[in-house]
Amino acid sequence: MAAVTLNVSTLKPLGDRVLVKIAQQDEKTAGGIFLPDTAKEKPQVGEVVAVGPGKRNDEGKLIPMELKAGDRVLYSKYAGTEVKLGSDEYVLLAERDILAIVQ
C-alpha cells in the first residue's frame, strides 16, 4: 500500500463535520514569562478551513451547515480529533461541538 501525504486541500469533512485550524497561543505571559507546553491552556478558538455538506434528517433531506470556511469559531474544550498537518494543528469537530462564531 502506498503512503498518502495529507494536506489541508485534500481533506473534505464528511456529514456535519468541520475542520478547524487551531489558533496559536502566546509563548509567554503579559509579564514576559515563557510558558512550557505543559502549562499552556488548551485553545478553544480557531478558523474553519473546510466543512462537510451537512447531515440528513429523518426524511433524508440534507440540512446544510451554518458554518463556512473562514469563520472564526469557539468550540468545546475536549471535543473533536486533533490532526497535525505539517507544522499546523487542526481539530476535526462535529457541528454540534461548535459553540459560537466569533465576530
Swiss-Prot record:
> What is the similarity comment for this entry?
Belongs to the GroES chaperonin family.
Q: What compartments host this protein?
A: Cytoplasm
The record's annotation in InterPro entries points to:
Chaperonin_GroES, Chaperonin_GroES_sf, Chaprnonin_Cpn10_CS, GroES-like_sf
Q: Which gene encodes it?
A: groES
Q: What is the role of this chain?
A: Together with the chaperonin GroEL, plays an essential role in assisting protein folding. The GroEL-GroES system forms a nano-cage that allows encapsulation of the non-native substrate proteins and provides a physical environment optimized to promote and accelerate protein folding. GroES binds to the apical surface of the GroEL ring, thereby capping the opening of the GroEL channel.
Q: How does it assemble?
A: Heptamer of 7 subunits arranged in a ring. Interacts with the chaperonin GroEL.
GO cellular component terms listed in the entry, alphabetical order: cytoplasm
Q: Its principal location?
A: cytoplasm
Organism field: Synechococcus sp. (strain JA-3-3Ab)
| Name of the protein this chain belongs to | Co-chaperonin GroES
Q: Which Gene3D superfamilies match?
A: GroES chaperonin (2.30.33.40)
Which GO BP terms apply?
chaperone cofactor-dependent protein refolding
**Keyword Ribosomal protein included in the entry's annotation:** no
Protein keywords: Chaperone, Cytoplasm
Q: Name one GO molecular function term.
A: ATP binding
Quote the PROSITE patterns the UniProt record gives.
CHAPERONINS_CPN10
